[in-house]
Regions:
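Conserved alpha/beta core of the MobA/IspD/sugar-nucleotide pyrophosphorylase nucleotidyltransferase superfamily
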Residues: 104-175
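Short, conserved catalytic or adaptor-binding loops enriched in Gly and charged residues
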Residues: 8-13, 96, 140-141
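Conserved beta-strand scaffold positions in the cores of enzyme catalytic domains, especially
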Residues: 19, 74, 148-150
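Short, flexible, basic/aromatic active-site loop/helix in glycosyltransferases
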Residues: 87-112
Length: 175
């Protein structure tokens, strides 16, 4: 509602441009946000899509992602994986071990030229066989020919989803 938007804007020093409803799935929420920008005539050159659960983001990472989006059209914050990763079969048996040197843990922000991500999302929304979409980079990878650049992030940019994550995030914030 307009009242909720005013309350959010008051609390966040007018940094909030538009407030829109989320969706059933993550991709629905992102698409709703992209659509709201267009509907309200606030179409930017670039958008950064970020998880609210990643509270330890830094200004430096945001600025880096903006620069990378300007240079590459599409980029995602990421860190090299530390652990060995296994591919399993449907019964829970390991069937393959990918080379760890080629694996990255994807984070947010995920940064794109607005028109690129909007076009990709519009194609995805029309595709009934879209499959399991877990991040915005997947949408660009699947529905455009643009390659997504992996932008070195920090292991401190964690997603807070469990009580243990809260303890870890608090330790980062206290430093």
């Amino acid at each position: 509602s307009d009242l909720q938007t005013l309350e959010i804007k008051a609390r966040h020093n007018e940094k909030v441009i538009i407030v829109t409803e989320g969706g059933k799935e993550r991709y629905n929420s992102v698409y709703n946000g992209l659509e709201a920008l267009k509907k309200h005539g606030k179409v930017p050159d670039y958008v950064l899509i970020h998880d609210g659960a990643r509270a330890c983001i830094t200004t430096d990472l945001i600025e880096k992602c903006i620069c990378e989006a300007e240079k590459y059209k599409a980029c995602v914050a990421a860190v090299p994986v530390k652990d060995t990763i296994k591919i399993s079969d449907e019964n829970g048996y390991a069937v393959n071990t990918p080379d760890r040197k080629t694996l990255w843990q994807i984070q947010t922000p995920q940064s794109f030229e607005y028109e690129l991500i909007m076009d990709a999302y519009e194609k995805m929304i029309k595709d009934s066989a879209r499959g399991n979409i877990t991040d915005d980079a997947m949408v660009v990878e699947k529905y455009t020919s643009v390659r997504v650049k992996l932008t070195q992030s920090s292991y401190k940019n964690i997603k807070i989803t469990t009580p243990d994550d809260i303890i870890i995030a608090e330790s980062f914030i206290k430093k």
